[in-house]
Amino acid sequence: MIKVIFFDLDDTLVDTTKLAELARRNAIENMIRHGLPVDFETAYSELMELIKEYGSNFPHHFDYLLRRLDLPYNPKWVSAGVIAYHNTKFAYLREVPGARKVLIRLRELGYRLGIITDGNPVKQWEKILRLEIDDFFEHVIISDFEGVKKPHPKIFKKALKAFNVDAQEALMVGDRLYSDIYGAKNVGMKTVWFKYGKYSKEELEYREYADYEIEKLQDLLKVIENENGSNKEVHPAR
């Protein structure tokens, strides 16, 4: 029987993909507005290359962007990018549709909830606290704090140990087939692939590790009912 439900954070509970793209575009526009002597498409393309190389949690994207563009360091331009990026994040941060209702219902049904996410602990906690969903979760496991990223089994085992449950008693919900689904399945958890955001059509070679697939987070409730024997309408992933 499932007792604990783990969620990924980005594009599982928090609508991250759309937010990040908007924030980056606004950052470049604000840098140009304050004197960056480069056209938007060139600057944005270089920024995306930087993110691809260094990851989205790298703290010096805008500093390195100036180097990539063969421009001298200018704190005004960097500050303009940082301010616009964070202002956009704060203004447009949203939950994935239906997330809060699902969390409320799962708590009402007596399930214990946790988060297993990759990323910078301060940035991830900022999202959780700004959306005021922290009270739903007993434990939040974040890769950069633990020293190991998904899909490494250690981070999933750490989460199971925190809840003192066996893998068969836990279910992982995430948007990434490789890091979330493959990783959780390898330690024995049940898995639900949430087909949302930029990874909904990627990493399909790991699709076989998903026990279920859902396109709306609300459908997780049917999955849970099916797993615990009270609903036979949900069908496992193909």
UniProtKB/Swiss-Prot annotation:
Protein EC: 3.1.3.-
Keywords: Hydrolase, Magnesium, Metal-binding
GO aspect biological process, one term: small molecule biosynthetic process
Co-factor(s): Mg(2+)
SUPFAM superfamilies in UniProt: HAD-like
Entries under Pfam families matching the protein: Hydrolase
GO molecular function, one term: metal ion binding
Top-tier EC class: hydrolase
CDD domains assigned: HAD_Neu5Ac-Pase_like (cd04305)
Recorded family membership: Belongs to the HAD-like hydrolase superfamily.
Biological role: Catalyzes the dephosphorylation of D,L-glyceraldehyde 3-phosphate in vitro.
Name used for this protein in its record: Glyceraldehyde 3-phosphate phosphatase
Record organism: Pyrococcus abyssi (strain GE5 / Orsay)
